[in-house]
From Swiss-Prot:
Molecular function (Gene Ontology), one example: rRNA binding
SUPFAM superfamilies from the UniProt entry: Ribosomal protein S8
Residue spans crossing the bilayer: none
Name of encoding gene: rpsH
Function: One of the primary rRNA binding proteins, it binds directly to 16S rRNA central domain where it helps coordinate assembly of the platform of the 30S subunit.
Database matches in NCBIfam families: PRK00136.1
Protein name: Small ribosomal subunit protein uS8
Length: 132
């Protein structure tokens, strides 16, 4: 099966697993997904992830979801920039998500980072997704 937007697929898997209160979710591995998962782990939205390689199969990431008082820490995760409509933002245009309680994940010339890290580095870029 071909996949047009692997990042949207990962976001949908995380959303579905959190709704079903799963402890872990698997998704095919890629460099972009790894960098987005690094940001989610650094910001405290997931416990972590590990690379699982099975013989004769493509490598996968096993993502450990995080819960607080039985509720998922990721209340909402949504793709912003899509293959059909790319969304770019400068530093001035980056608005806080949910009054600073959420983050935007950006792909910048300096790598994939959160909106606060992008402000510190003074770089804009493609807004991949929003998390709160």
């Amino acid at each position: 099966m071909s996949m047009n937007d692997p990042l949207s697929d990962m976001i949908a898997r995380i959303k579905n697993a959190a709704t079903r209160k799963r402890a872990k979710v698997a998704t095919p591995a890629s460099k972009l997904r790894a960098r987005v998962l690094d940001v989610l782990a650094d910001e405290g939205y997931i416990r972590g992830y590990s690379l699982v390689e099975k013989p004769g199969a493509f490598p996968e990431f096993e993502i450990e979801l995080k819960y607080f008082d039985g509720e998922p820490v990721i209340a909402e995760i949504a793709r912003v920039s899509k293959p059909g409509r790319r969304v770019y933002s400068s530093i001035k245009d980056l608005k806080p998500i949910k009054n600073g309680l959420g983050i935007s994940i950006l792909s910048t010339p300096k790598g994939v980072m959160s909106d606060s890290a992008a402000r510190d580095a003074n770089v804009g870029g493609e807004v991949l997704c929003r998390v709160y």
